């Protein structure tokens, strides 16, 4: 069993402006950079990292870089598009408050619902878990990512009913830990597609 530390990026320009970013590559704010460094100080008090994974989007990657610097860790960051935020299609760059007032909340919370041209939580889960299941067990791992991504991964680890996962709040730049076994991601991937596992 290995300790995994899940870290949502610090405040981004899109967070501050209250717009959906999804796959858009937006930067951290000055506050977001401070949050990332503070997270690194917390991570310094945890077991030493042996592996670091990150979304390739700059808000997650920069959060990982700043957190590692603050923690004194010099590991290389393995970045991948497989750990990106949920693609929100036509909603990317649009006002969160306006879209939620127009009924987007139910779609966002649904396991299978998606924005026009975007991904559902189920599609995000398929993409991310397939990638993680293909990785060797490196021991204590930091995963720097996004609210939607981490919401899905923690929900699946914890056994949260799929249609409740979308309601889980993931704060910016607060390290969240779970114990992950060598078969955890493979078992979760099978659970997402029980018919193909037979």
Regions found by a protein language model. Name each.
Residues 1-3, 39, 69, 73, ...:
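Acidic, low-complexity terminal tails and accessory targeting/binding regions
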Residues 7-71, 102, 119:
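Active-site-proximal alpha-helix that buttresses catalytic centers in soluble enzyme cores
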Residues 37-44, 125, 129-137:
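Generic structural signal for well-ordered alpha-helical scaffold segments
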Residues 56, 111, 147:
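Short secondary-structure boundary segments
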Residues 59, 149-150:
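Alpha-helix capping/helix-boundary segments
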Residues 4, 139-148:
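Generic beta-sheet signal
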Residues 49-56, 78, 140-144:
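Short glycine-rich phosphate-binding loop at a beta-alpha junction
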Residues 69-127, 167, 188:
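Phosphate-handling substructures
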